[in-house]
Amino acid sequence: MASKQTPMMEQYQRVKDQYPDAFLFYRLGDFYEMFNEDAVKGAQLLELTLTSRSKSKDNSIPMCGVPHRAVDNYVDILIDKGYKVAICEQMEDPKTTKGMVKREVTRLVTPGTTMDLAGDAARQNNYLTALKQEQGGYNLAYADLSTGELKVTKVSNEAAAINELVNLQTREVVTEPEVSASLLDQLTKRNILRSTQGQVVNQAEVAYLSQDLTDAGQRDVVALLVSYLLTTQKRSLAHLQRAVAYQLSSFMKIDHRSKVNLELTTNLRSGKRQGTLAWLLDETKTAMGSRLLKQWLDRPLLDQAKIERRYDRVQELLDHYFERQNLQEELIKVYDLERLAGRVAYGSVNGRDLIQLKTSLEQVPKIKYILQTLDVPAFDDLEQALDPLEDVAGLIDRAIAPEPPISVTDGGVIRDGYNHQLDEYRGAMQNGKQWIADLQEQERRATGINNLKIGYNHVFGYYIEVTKANIDKLPADRYERKQTLVNAERFATPELKEKESLILGAQDKSTALEYELFVKVREAVKEQIDRLQKLAANLAALDVIQAFAKVAEDYHFVRPSLNHDHQLQIEDGRHPVVEKFMGHQEYVPNDVLMGGDTSILLITGPNMSGKSTYMRQLALTAVMAQMGCFVPAKRAQLPIFDQIFTRIGAADDLVSGESTFMVEMMEANNALQNATADSLILFDEIGRGTATYDGMALAQAIIEFVHNRVGAKTLFSTHYHELTALEGELDHLQNVHVGATEENGELVFLHKVTPGPADKSYGIHVAKLAGMPTPLLTRANQILTSLEGQETAAVPSRGVEPPAPVIEPTPAKEQTPVKEQTTPLVEESSGQLELFATAPVEKKDGKADKLARQVKNLDLMSMTPMDVMNQVYKWQQNLK
């Protein structure tokens, strides 16, 4: 039978029962301990030694712990793995407390509420999101506890809510206790931690933060979010800004999968930031500027006036090189004001943080002067909005030591001269030893006792020791006996008692007074949080603008011209990231010419020729333009796109194994159902995931639907070359192709997009690039020559069947109709530009002809280079 729990373990269990889904870090002296299941799992995750509090087999309690000074490092590890950690502190001094020390949880750290962000995480937002369902959709609120940002919106359905969660990269979602099973399933699939909050707490704070909201549902979801924060953090949320409502319809919509396909923030190959548009554009000098750039990238604007305003500012900094250089030099000295303000309000700021805050504020007058020298209207309002907070900077300068320690409780934080009493304490501490030495010499002279000495012990404190042979020399009225030894007596004097009290109490009193003064300084700064946050927002915006100006100069970007008549004219456009990686190699620019009468470009050409790059570069150009950034082109005129849809597979050298025909159709359907005439659609080889006839029929039907019903600007790449005949049937479709040529029998990709369809597939050349055996390639050429001879006699004068009945597609929504046009259904005629023809050949050699048939039937144009290499490897093994 297990023995009864100790009082301490009973206390531990009571606290643990309140936080069953969190690791409980229970303070015991200089360590935070974990027990039972927390200890077993924590030891594994944190690589700690698992021990036992009781050595009894019948009552063994697993235990492990971490030093209190290193606790943040261990908490961060658990948070990064998606867990919660409850910090249980000692609320009383064990040295002065009789019985059990009172303990309670002072904060609950979760993936969505962590404040200690360093490294790459410092340049990213950490959003905690709340979801609350209502009739007709969801209300969604999110906050970054480290910066104080608080926003709220409304989405129409669960899919839109999940898309917004993924776009926000939220790691934790707060819901009411009862939610739909499908929502829980979606959160689980995406490794998003779900937390629950029932009762709304602190109505006054909730009311303050939601006072600008007119929608009751949005106020409710903000209340849910703020209540969770108050419950878990157990401290003031004074730095949270009043909730700002936004509408997704105010920004260009790009769903998460399209963002992934376009590599806006995450590289498809590495999963990292390098090689993305965000990586290319991020020439910001501050962490808050980097976070704002990511927000602008996530939400390109639709308001032309706001976009042009950003263009004007970029242009001014682009035109003033030296001012821009000076501005960059000052911005580098600005620390993360948003998160510094958050730590001030949160009560976690230290002396070094305040020095960083002061250093940042000292740069503001210099930045204002630089903007004043520009003397242009574009920066007038921004310059005037930059508040240097001289009162705050002055207070920190007077109060805080230039190089304070990290700890605020061990002394050394307050500057000398700030407080007279503190200076006295410090003087006593620093001069105590010298004063004792001087007193000893003074007493020797006064008494004539040369071996008189002053000593100290913990029992009696400071004392004057005199040998018994010299006792008679002491004046009776000044010396008070404290201790008698065998050969000596120890005494005290009024002066020694007075100094003893000052010296012994100086350290404790100094430390306590320093902390009291520091808290007063911190609270004084806290009162200016609103001003600090506004300054941070303005400096972040200025930082992003200078970054745009720098990349515009470095990469020869130009200011685009925006229009509302669907004119898309890009001269010498480039893919900015590909161009950067090519280094000294010359990137081949391409035009995108789609007037008001052209809505679809049908793109043909061999694999590896650059079709996907051409499509992506247009989308990136549109995103950059509506961010307020200049674009990679010689000249660019663009409409304002309301949405971008993509159906583009993974990069050509990836084999993800995730792209199924169903996913392809679902993504295509998303575009067809939601696109408008103001949207941009990129369809890359639609239909390749199924049989040839099915794929071709679907591809043609999709083209017709977009042409007749949607009217969006669309780039549609295909290997179904029969579809190029649609140019003669659909008024708003134009053929273009990515060229290639042969030089000395070698295939050369031109990477140049020109009008008209591709006239040759170069399939065998691509096979050669993939490393196929020379005998195989020779045989394939023989077969191809034979088949081309047969085709010459068999090819009809047209590649499209006579007209056949066409089922009218059901429109996704009522729009201004485009003239309805249908075309005959295409067939897989002998005129198709296949990689290898499919006609039978006479068998001459069993193994060779079997291999030739396999080569002939290989649909190389729909395969990646990796697919080809794997197949060639199998053939090589069979030939051995």
From Swiss-Prot:
Q: What role is this protein assigned?
A: This protein is involved in the repair of mismatches in DNA. It is possible that it carries out the mismatch recognition step. This protein has a weak ATPase activity.
What is any one GO biological process for this UniProt entry? mismatch repair
Polar residues composition bias: which ranges? 818-829
Question: Where does the source fall among the domains of life?
Answer: Bacteria
Q: Which Gene3D superfamilies match?
A: 1.10.1420.10, DNA repair protein MutS, domain I (3.40.1170.10), MutS, connector domain (3.30.420.110), P-loop containing nucleotide triphosphate hydrolases (3.40.50.300)
Q: Which Pfam family is one of those matched by this entry?
A: MutS_III
Identification of the protein by name: DNA mismatch repair protein MutS
Q: Which UniProt keywords apply?
A: ATP-binding, DNA damage, DNA repair, DNA-binding, Nucleotide-binding
Please indicate if the UniProt record lists ATP-binding as a keyword. Answer: yes
Q: Give the Gene Ontology MF terms in alphabetical order.
A: ATP binding; ATP-dependent DNA damage sensor activity; damaged DNA binding; mismatched DNA binding
Native organism is: Limosilactobacillus fermentum (strain NBRC 3956 / LMG 18251) (Lactobacillus fermentum)
The family annotation for this protein states: Belongs to the DNA mismatch repair MutS family.
Q: Where is this region: Disordered?
A: 790-829
